[in-house]
Amino acid sequence: MKFRKGRPKILRLISEEPQFKLFKPVGIPRTDLESEVLTFEELESIRLVDYLNHPHEDAADEMGISRRVFWNILKSARKKVADALINGKMIDIGGGYYKIRDCNYEDECQRGKFCKYGVSNCLRLKNRDSE
């Protein structure tokens, strides 16, 4: 049995799972492509910093992790995306060590199939559907 050394790993908070989980070059069958696996937390780090222009400190706080851990995740994500774009690889998005951040609209939540606040992959909605 293996034991981890150091501090226990904490779950990274993400806003939601992405709607699209696969990107590939046009005109090449999937079977002929190498792929890069981008975890959900790596995608979230790119979303927060590169898409929403959050400073690293704020983005790390949103994900519930230290700035150092955030920087390592972001660096890994950028390297994978650059490799896929330059070398024509497929990007497969999935996995990781995460949980979906609470949306803070519990009291007003009136979800049918969709959230009026734009949270498309809500845990409460999933739990309600499975009951």
Curated annotation (Swiss-Prot):
Residue ranges crossing the lipid bilayer per the database entry: none
Superkingdom of this protein's organism: Archaea
Coiled coil stretches, renumbered: none
InterPro entries reported in the protein's UniProt record: UPF0251
Family statement: Belongs to the UPF0251 family.
HAMAP family, sorted: UPF0251
Name of the protein in its database record: UPF0251 protein MMP0619
